[in-house]
Design a protein with these regions (language model features):
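Polybasic/polar functional segments that serve as interface/processing modules
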Residues: 1-141
Length: 141
């Protein structure tokens, strides 16, 4: 088979760091609820999350292989990075989008409000999973 990626430092030990973060806001009126959702959607859109994740991958010493991002209607966003320990061969081909050298970083947002209650909520799920020599725990320093 051509175009195989060379694995190095592979140790079959997956290291994962996951966060589930919640923000609950008292929003008495429909206008306040929608204003909160608009604010969250602007602050945590896929472009902004991508920039934050670029910084995160630099912190753990990973190189980004591929980025997939999506904003949702009416609200919410998802971003996934495939990562490697070091830069790979340039122009590996489209198959690199489905396969990875070391692992992934994902962020998913879930802003919502309850129309019959005075609540607006925001949940973000962050998952960093690696194998090999890089570790997500270095982001905690």
């Amino acid at each position: 088979m051509k175009n195989k990626l060379k694995l190095h430092g592979f140790n079959n030990l997956t290291k994962s760091l996951s966060f589930n973060i919640y923000d609950v806001c008292y929003a008495k009126t429909s206008k306040e609820q929608l204003s909160y959702i608009d604010y969250i959607d602007e602050e945590y859109n896929s472009e902004r999350i991508t920039n934050i994740m670029m910084h995160l991958t630099e912190k753990i010493g990973a190189k980004v292989i591929s980025v997939s991002k999506q904003d949702y209607d009416p609200q919410g966003a998802s971003v996934t990075f495939l990562i490697a320990e070091k830069s790979l061969i340039p122009h590996c081909g489209s198959e690199i989008l489905a396969h990875l050298d070391k692992s992934h970083v994902t962020v998913h947002t879930y802003p919502e409000y309850h129309p019959d209650r005075s609540l607006a909520t925001f949940r973000v799920d962050i998952d960093v999973a690696t194998c090999g020599e890089i570790t997500p725990l270095s982001t905690l320093d």
